[in-house]
Amino acid sequence: MLSDINKISSEENICINAICFTGDLINAGSNNETDFDLFFENFVFPLLENTGLDLKNIFFVPGNHEIDTSKIDEYAEAGICSKLIDSESIEAFFNKPSPAVLDRINYFQRIYDSFCEAPLIYKDEFCRCYRVDINNVVFGFACLNSAWRSSGKGAIERGKMIIGAVQVKNALDAISDVDVKVCLVHHPLDWLVESDQFDVEKAIYNFDLIFNGHIHTLDSKQIIAYQGQSVISTCGKFFPTKDFYNGYSIVSIDPETLEGKIYLRQYYSGSRECFDKNLQLYDDGCFEFVLGNRDPLLIKAFEILHDIQPGFVEYATGFFISNIAGHKHVKSFEDAFVIPVLGRFSEYEKSLIMNLKI
């Protein structure tokens, strides 16, 4: 990877000024002291030396692998699952968090104190924010914690994570006067509980750049898209195996025009064993964007539509025939939708099927 970074930096005339990690830095939080020492000694420090940077230039967030599962209180866990069910209860928790619930990830504050030396401008139990001047452009880095609700159970946690709109808004307030707002968070938004996803989406798209991770499957790979005029970059697993998508990204921003590019780098195993362009998503393995073009009217329109969406869905659900005339209550459109049976057929097989139907 180091040689690949040097190659891209030379070819594209890029200077690396910051390094961001979006979680799953170690294998298990229960071994955090040993594993973090190994992570920094064998990966981070060589990377910093290669790029000429130091601990003032790295930013990171915890992922589900950082959770110390030995610290999870099963009774506190059962209680929090039954309580955090809507926007009001989630907001109340963030205003007065329970130490028993956060015990599984509390050690990560020590990791921040030991290994992140960037200028800190805000911190609480969940979030840390930093302010950095890069080539006369002021960047605000908000490191959000989406992993605090994880219990290390993997895919079954989808739809159960919580970021909390309060956490996002506190971070935005802390970096409100910077030129470029950058958000680091581990879980994609579709891993959040439904009520939290609605609230967080409305707030988080005030960031210019949103970096997240957690996606380890070939289906998702690396996703970059405009959402509310924010650029979202989701990176796959960084581990040299054939069964997962592996890669990283280099984000380049022109300090004068705020025009940017994201260079998508994918690891190719087998005979090559190297990083190269990811051509599966974008031509030439590069995504181009422009920051700073936020239309206040479009933002307001997005907020209005976003606010009425839950109420409209609830209202429309009441008109299901099964809700009106039947005895079974259908809670949502998702509950009523039946996935059609799909299959792969050649043109010859399809013609036989059509003939049988005729």
Give residue spans per PLM region.
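N-terminal active-site segment of His-dependent metallophosphoesterases
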Residues: M1-L38, L47-K56, D68-T69, N170-D177
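Divalent metal-coordination and catalytic microenvironments
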Residues: I19, D24, F39, G63, ...
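Active-site environment of divalent metal-dependent phosphoester hydrolases
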Residues: I26-S30, F60-Y75, S151-G152, H187-S195, ...
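Active-site neighborhood of divalent metal-dependent phosphoester bond hydrolases
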Residues: L48-K123
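Binuclear metal-dependent hydrolase catalytic cores centered on His/Asp/Glu-rich metal-binding motifs
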Residues: E91-V178
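Conserved beta-sheet core of the metallophosphoesterase superfamily
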Residues: N136, D190-I262
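Active-site-proximal segments of metal-dependent phosphoesterases and phosphodiesterases across multiple
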Residues: S146-I215, S220
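A short C-terminal boundary segment appended to hydrolase-like catalytic domains
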Residues: I253-L356
